Amino acid sequence: IRTSHVMAKMINENFDPAFFKVVEGGISETNALLAERFDKIFFTGSVAVGKIVYQAAAKYLTPVTLELGGKSPAIITDAANLKLHVKRIIWAKFINAGQTCIAPDYILLPKSLEQEFLTLAKAEIAQEHFAVANDNYVQIINTKNVQRLANLLDPAKVYCGGGFNEQTRVFEPTIMQQVSFDDKIM
């Protein structure tokens, strides 16, 4: 599914372009846009590109909101309905192949719930709608990001998943365990 194309079509067909417009593109389109003067810039993406956006906005003192990712935890307590929480966390993490800014990146839970959580999570990922063979399976945005993700994996800590294909830009839903804040993935 070409989500950005669908969004651009819907917005550009229904809003006055003087008010709101979606422009799809790469580096050249982004550079052309950054040369323009705007009332406000809202950017979601990498730190590296965020710095470029901010520097360009400074030329006109344009207000900027940067959403540059980060790490979003999910916290589970002893009182939680674990099966329900696992279902919701897996959905939230793997929608759009985890490429959403609020996707949970790690789980904080009592040690006593760890194994049950892992078992339930692996079973949830095994559902057909998460299958890599599914025609609607979402691709990672580009090969560079597939390589970036692959470099973050510590094979010794992969509980399930971890497979990827650079050519098709598909990365299996992956769960790692015993991860510390010193690991590359964090």
Language-model features and meaning:
Residues 1-18, 61:
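Conserved small-residue-rich beta-alpha loop and adjacent elements
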Residues 1-2, 27-29, 48-49, 59:
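Short alpha-helical
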Residues 4, 21-39:
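A structured beta-alpha segment of the ubiquitous adenosine-cofactor-binding alpha/beta core
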Residues 9, 13, 35, 55, ...:
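Short, well-ordered alpha-helices that flank and scaffold nucleotide-derived cofactor binding pockets
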Residues 14-21, 36, 44, 48-51:
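Phosphate/pyrophosphate-binding betaalpha-module
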Residues 23-26, 44, 92:
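Conserved residues at the C-terminal ends of beta-strands
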Residues 40, 48-184:
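ALDH superfamily catalytic-core signature
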